[in-house]
């Protein structure tokens, strides 16, 4: 459960184990930035395990692109941020301790333009930079650090929908809704997040009116019948006419910019629209409902993605080629052309398309991931391993990237490294016992090099430092008879 995970994440520590600074802000006295980061990572591992995170590299890259623009104008450089998308039709967004910011697909689809999306992200970023979680805890002072950590583990209001197959994920929802209401950011914190966020939007080049604009959209969502379910965003971020008016007034201090969405805003929306259908045929039918010649480039892109998912590669390729010819700057168009060429077994053309794109956009995460997947299908595992490893060494990886590089290493015949990457994948998704078990399997390989042995054993020792007594016992129970003391604990 979430509670058990956080007990582990806080390293078996009670309040006595956490060193409180002699001086500093009241928030630091209750929850240091390192505590926040540790708690946030533990919650993120739980979310990853729930299977609710959208694993589309193009969508993930886009949300981080918008978030990073905002962060650059509000962060002092001491706080890292990670933005991610949750597959959930409910309209919601949330900030976790440690700078992890989640946005539901339902909220992304509810925004009418990029400025509205930027407004939501700016508001959540401000909650993190202003330390609102720690400050809310300081205001109560009644709970120990340990209880607070457990409470914070449940901050995810609606991380996954209530009808999820994953029982654990369902527990996250139940705990999350209760906890976000329990912490219940004060009205002053909400106004402060609006103020800081609007400033960051203006400085980052977004139209600051986008925040109030989205608040107005949300306020119209409020059902008159109280028995109807409010959107999650309204329950966790109450919107009043006064708050909308204040946001509008603050935005007037910045020059009004005509709203012009980036191409990537439309591309992310089109991909999520395709994914929102239960069947590939449903998505195709939606995008074919308008005459092709009447569609704009984003609608045509969505149509091509729907064709691609339905296996109509020739139809998809024709559209991707047309779009790429018109705009060479859009990475998603290069990916679409390359993928459909490979699917049509035009292998030389597909590889050439990806190579050209990689030279234009070096170390672009979605581009390298899609190229790596294409190379694996062609049986070029060594090359896939090489480009994925270069990306991982230069850009902080997602769990999906690590899982893909494990596939590449395995296909290339490097079993030891494949097991190492699988271990890292399990660690990133919160499974410490599984992480060690893959390293132990690697240590048992007869062809293991000495430098790998030293590296893997050091990694095991490092992981064990973060394991609870129960996890150590679980690890011991899972060991084969005769396992070494290092391996069995």
Language-model segments: what does each one mean?
Residues 23-30, 41, 53, 61, ...:
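Extracytoplasmic and endomembrane cell-envelope/extracellular-matrix remodeling and assembly machinery
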Residues 1-2, 6-94, 179, 223, ...:
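Hydrophobic or amphipathic, alpha-helical segments that drive membrane association/targeting
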Residues 102-119, 183-188:
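Short pre-active-site segment immediately N-terminal to the catalytic Zn-binding motif
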């Amino acid at each position: 459960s979430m509670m058990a995970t956080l007990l582990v994440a806080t390293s078996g520590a009670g309040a006595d184990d956490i060193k409180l600074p002699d001086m500093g802000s009241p928030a630091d006295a209750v929850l240091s930035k390192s505590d926040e980061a540790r708690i946030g990572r533990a919650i993120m591992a739980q979310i990853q395990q729930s299977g609710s995170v959208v694993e589309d590299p193009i969508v993930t890259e886009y949300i981080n692109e918008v978030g990073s623009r905002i962060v650059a104008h509000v962060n002092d450089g001491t706080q890292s941020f990670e933005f991610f998308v949750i597959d959930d039709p409910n309209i919601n967004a949330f900030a976790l301790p440690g700078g992890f910011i989640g946005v539901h697909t339902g909220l992304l689809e509810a925004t009418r333009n990029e400025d509205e999306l930027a407004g939501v992200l700016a508001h959540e970023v401000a909650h993190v930079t202003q330390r609102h979680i720690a400050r809310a805890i300081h205001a109560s002072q009644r709970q120990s650090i340990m209880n607070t950590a457990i409470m914070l583990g449940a901050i995810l209001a609606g991380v996954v929908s209530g009808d999820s197959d994953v029982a654990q994920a369902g527990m996250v929802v139940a705990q999350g809704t209760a906890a976000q209401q329990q912490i219940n950011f004060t009205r002053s914190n909400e106004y402060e997040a609006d103020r800081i966020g609007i400033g960051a939007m203006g400085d980052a080049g977004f139209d600051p009116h986008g925040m109030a604009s989205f608040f107005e959209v949300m306020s119209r969502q409020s059902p008159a019948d109280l028995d109807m379910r409010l959107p999650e965003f309204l329950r966790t971020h109450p919107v009043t006419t006064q708050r909308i008016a204040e946001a509008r007034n603050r935005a007037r201090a910045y020059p009004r910019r005509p709203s012009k969405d980036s191409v990537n805003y439309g591309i992310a929306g089109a991909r999520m629209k395709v994914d929102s259908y239960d069947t590939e045929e449903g998505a195709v039918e939606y995008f074919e409902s308008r005459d092709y010649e009447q569609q704009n480039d984003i609608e045509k892109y969505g149509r091509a993605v729907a064709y691609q998912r339905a296996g109509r590669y020739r139809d998809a390729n024709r559209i991707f080629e047309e779009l790429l010819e018109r705009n060479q700057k859009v990475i998603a168009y290069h990916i679409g052309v390359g993928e459909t060429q490979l699917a049509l077994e035009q292998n030389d053309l597909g590889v050439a398309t990806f190579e050209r794109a990689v030279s234009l956009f070096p170390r672009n995460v979605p581009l390298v991931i899609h190229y790596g997947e294409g190379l694996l299908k062609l049986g070029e595992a060594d090359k896939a391993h090489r480009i994925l490893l270069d990306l991982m060494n230069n850009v902080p990886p997602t769990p999906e990237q690590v899982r893909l590089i494990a596939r590449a290493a395995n296909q290339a015949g490097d079993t030891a490294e494949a097991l190492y990457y699988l271990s890292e994948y399990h660690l990133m998704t919160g499974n410490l016992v599984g992480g060690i078990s893959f390293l132990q399997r690697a240590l048992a390989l007869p062809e293991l090099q000495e430098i790998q042995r030293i590296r893997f054993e050091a990694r095991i020792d490092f992981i064990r430092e973060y394991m609870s007594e129960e996890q150590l016992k679980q690890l011991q129970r899972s060991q084969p008879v005769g396992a070494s003391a290092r391996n069995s604990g």
